[in-house]
Regions:
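Walker B motif beta-strand of ABC-family P-loop ATPases
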Residues: 86-92
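Conserved beta-strand-loop-alpha-helix hinge in the C-terminal portion
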Residues: 140, 144-167
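Walker B catalytic motif
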Residues: 92-93, 100
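Helical segment within the ABC ATPase nucleotide-binding domain
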Residues: 102-115
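Conserved H-loop
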Residues: 116-132
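Conserved D-loop-proximal element of ABC-family nucleotide-binding domains
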Residues: 98-103, 148
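ABC-family P-loop ATPase nucleotide-binding domains
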Residues: 5-85
Length: 190
């Protein structure tokens, strides 16, 4: 399983290539295979970096250290491409990205996904779904799933917003507002 964070952590002192090589080799060993030679790994990494439109210079930079939001998300999508999990949870991968960066992220996820990888995309915006058509759409409000449907539900939410959902589930909407108020209070007191 792979988890893509809304706000990826910076890890100074660990460069991207070394982090990915160690992760990749750990996965190989876990699957009963031998570790890959560093030169062979570099070839695989270079190819995957092209797949996610990432400049090779990022191999030597520390993991997410000083990266822009778009660079962090691309680095995370590169990790997803290299590790090829059976299932991935992408938590607001589009958060803080401009329209071009969201498009690149969406296209990259579509290129590396496939029938052998389940992906749960958590998003507030439909643009990330342009190249990743959902089989199922679930709406979470107040900490619970209140409505489910297919891609048409995602399209409806994009066009009409969440007002219908909030009105249809007033208890969940009230719980959501209370959770938001608590988060704001925590932010101002910390």
């Amino acid at each position: 399983m792979f988890l893509g964070f809304q706000y990826p952590v910076e890890i100074p002192g660990v460069n991207n290539a070394e982090f990915l090589r160690m992760s990749y080799n750990a996965l190989l060993v876990h699957n009963g295979e031998e570790e890959i030679d560093p030169l062979d790994f570099d070839e695989i990494l270079d190819a995957k970096m092209k797949t996610v439109d990432m400049d090779p210079k990022y191999k030597d930079r520390f993991l997410n250290d000083g990266f822009s939001g778009g660079e962090m998300k691309r680095a995370e999508i590169l990790q997803l491409a290299m590790l090829r999990p059976q299932f991935a949870i992408l938590d607001e991968t589009d958060s803080g990205l401009d329209a071009d960066a969201v498009r690149l992220a969406s296209e990259s996820i579509a290129r590396i996904g496939g029938a052998e990888m389940g992906i749960l995309i958590i998003t507030h915006h439909e643009q990330l779904l342009e190249h990743n058509i959902p089989l199922q759409t679930h709406v979470m409000l107040g900490g619970r799933i209140v409505e489910s449907g297919g891609p048409e539900l995602a399209a409806e939410l994009h066009k009409q917003g969440y007002d219908r959902i909030r009105k249809a589930y007033p208890e969940a909407a009230a719980a959501e507002e209370a959770m938001e108020a608590e988060r704001r209070l925590e932010t101002t007191t910390s």
